[in-house]
Amino acid sequence: MRYFLEMVLGRLVNHPDEIDVEETSDDRGILFRIRVNPEDLGRIIGRNGRTIEAIRSLLNAASRDNRRVFVEVEDGEGPS
């Protein structure tokens, strides 16, 4: 699933070489923390958060074993 997320993000941003995805897992589900070039934050989040919500929906639909998937985008000031 991490590869899928990195592939989607790579197509959205202008600086694909600066994508950093950190994955952690526990009994509640899987957490992906995304860090990108500050210029690409708007492209990842989208208008009114629509793009990041679509990414979250895709990851939850692709999740195996019905595990929840959480996605946080970090902007240098912490997760959002």
Name each model-derived stretch.
Residues 45-49:
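Glycine-centered tight-turn and secondary-structure capping sites
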